[in-house]
Design a protein with these regions (language model features):
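An acidic/histidine-cluster motif and surrounding catalytic segment
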Residues: 1-10, 15-215
């Protein structure tokens, strides 16, 4: 698909979409191609937009696989073996930068390294980080994951947190042109995805276990 068309739009079977989802995705793929963007997301958590924020999209250094698209040249940047992992996991500065959009990201990558190979999207996310290329998000969500209630492959204990209402409309002429995250939105985004203190302690112990014992 990517080799033939140069781009792809992906939906899992438990994703509900707004009627104009495909129009948005194709327009965004056209607009952001060759602009330093890694992927396009159809989902967004509910964020409070700054009063002076006039755009219909925003960017973050974290991808989302709930209805998304990318280009062949970005997909080809991914190192699916994550050969830099052992140096990354020992580098506090790199971990902090990767966790800019949620302190759950490094633990997800560690879980992948330890065998959870179905978590391919964290490898894609890490590649975007390595290459400094963000994901574009809509102002309001254009997809809803119906599988977070336990019926899908990946269930969530706090499913309601991720259930954003579908947008009633979307502007295709107000895409944010830059690729630097808005700092107010970044703070909200980080807080939305970050874990509890107890989970943070557990994740830290798991990281040190890997560093010291390789498991």
């Amino acid at each position: 698909m990517l080799a033939k068309h140069g781009r792809i739009i992906v939906l899992e079977d438990d994703i509900e979409v707004a009627p104009f989802f495909l129009r948005y995705m194709n327009s965004a793929l056209d607009f952001y191609e060759n602009r330093g963007v890694f992927s396009i997301s159809g989902y967004t958590p509910e964020l409070v937009m700054p009063r002076d924020y006039q755009f219909s999209t925003y960017v973050m250094h974290r991808n989302c696989s709930w209805g998304w698209g990318t280009w062949a040249q970005e997909w080809d940047k991914v190192d699916w073996e994550v050969k830099s992992f052992d140096s990354f996991i020992r580098n506090a500065r790199q971990r902090s930068a990767f966790n800019e959009c949620g302190n759950d990201l490094t633990p997800f990558l560690l879980r992948w390294k330890k065998g959870a190979r179905e978590m391919w999207d964290i490898v894609f996310c890490y590649a975007g980080f390595v290459h400094g290329r963000p994901t574009v998000y809509p102002r309001k969500s254009l997809v809803r994951n119906a599988g977070t209630d336990g019926t899908g492959s990946h269930a969530f204990a706090d499913a309601k947190k991720y259930s954003s209402p579908l947008a009633a409309n979307v502007s295709l002429s107000a895409f944010v042109p830059g690729v630097a995250p808005n700092q107010e939105l970044l703070k909200q985004f980080h807080d939305f995805y970050s874990t509890s203190t107890l989970r943070l302690i557990y994740n830290t112990l798991m990281r040190w276990r890997y560093i010291l014992f390789g498991k």
